[in-house]
Curated annotation (Swiss-Prot):
PROSITE patterns: AA_TRANSFER_CLASS_3. Homodimer. GO terms for molecular function: glutamate-1-semialdehyde 2,1-aminomutase activity; pyridoxal phosphate binding; transaminase activity. The modification N6-(pyridoxal phosphate)lysine is found at K265. Belongs to the class-III pyridoxal-phosphate-dependent aminotransferase family. HemL subfamily. It comes from Ectopseudomonas mendocina (strain ymp). Transmembrane segments: none annotated. The gene is hemL. Pathway: Porphyrin-containing compound metabolism; protoporphyrin-IX biosynthesis; 5-aminolevulinate from L-glutamyl-tRNA(Glu): step 2/2. This is Glutamate-1-semialdehyde 2,1-aminomutase.
Amino acid sequence: MSRSEILFANAQKHIPGGVNSPVRAFRSVGGTPLFFKHAEGAYVVDEDDKRYVDYVGSWGPMILGHSHPDVLDSVRRQLQHGLSYGAPTALETEMAELVCSLVPSMEMVRMVSSGTEATMSAIRLARGYTGRDSIIKFEGCYHGHSDSLLVKAGSGALTQGVPNSAGVPAAFAKHTLTLPFNDIDAVAECLAQVGKEVACIIVEPVAGNMNCVPPAPGFLEGLREQCDKHGVVLIFDEVMTGFRVALGGAQAHYGVTPDLTTFGKIIGGGMPVGCFGGKRAIMECIAPLGPVYQAGTLSGNPLAMAAGLTTLKLISRPGFHTELSDYTTRMLDGLQQRADAAGIPFVTTQAGAMFGLYFSGADDIVTFADVMASDSARFNRFFHLMLEGGVYLAPSAFEAGFTSIAHGDKELEITFAAAERAFAELKKA
């Protein structure tokens, strides 16, 4: 038995399913999940000492690559002063100032401890600000595991084939209206009927939890227009896209300004953290200034702030995001060429340093239906073949992939060699 098999068997004795987040269990792709013990640069190393080119990047935040020395040094320096105080620090103010300077739509920001907490708090804030109860989300978009958002969610929920979670009261779900992603006509029709009841629209500007589906031309602009028309708060969930699609996030890349924005662990260099922020008039509704309560003992914890400040400063250098995007384009072009040569129906999508891989004969992937029509069984086989070739992809056909600035020509060679073998094997099947 491999070390991962032994560790997984032991983990299942005391951890439900042997994992602390469902997608890690490999239920979608089959087999035993890998247990990792080390990561550096573009690579992760499992408990059997096998190295893999990593296209998961801890689900997005490792934009500098793993174990960047400057980030580690910043954490070591902070460690000498303590782990957490449960009190204000200069670091969190510096982080808030930096985030607001990089993302102009964010006039004020509140730190939290996860992306789920950020989206949950942003929705509560939108409800408190508007005095309305209903929210609109989109099919296949995942915004964390808070009760009101586990309705036709993407990510692990798609992987398991369960659109809703047990334990979510019907009274919660009835306030969540779910519409087709990239369908602005459906949004306009819905708001024409119930706009006075809707507090907010929350959207991933690039849907990163049904793999990677960029917005259709005019979709985000249409959301902004409809929200303005009906007095609805527009929330961009940029937990995945923030500081990755562009320095100012997807909102900068696509030129559409939301009212509120949520970010995740990238602002902590991969440590547990998140934040939400936006217009001052809305943010001043949060306690202690306003009636909307939100709190957290570890919010703005100094280790995450130290790591995040270093990360954001490093990715702010001119040309950083162009390099990231160029690598991603080269990688996807190479995969497409090899799939075409093998006669395998295959489509890729890209938004900056995010990407999607679909075994599909469609010309493009635009809707939730397009995603669900792709061949997930073939992806599962591809995943394991790539793993054998030393390439670690997300263990689900419905999760986006991520590149880092540490990926380069050597990693392309490994990726392309593994892909050639994988597509050849798929052709035989």
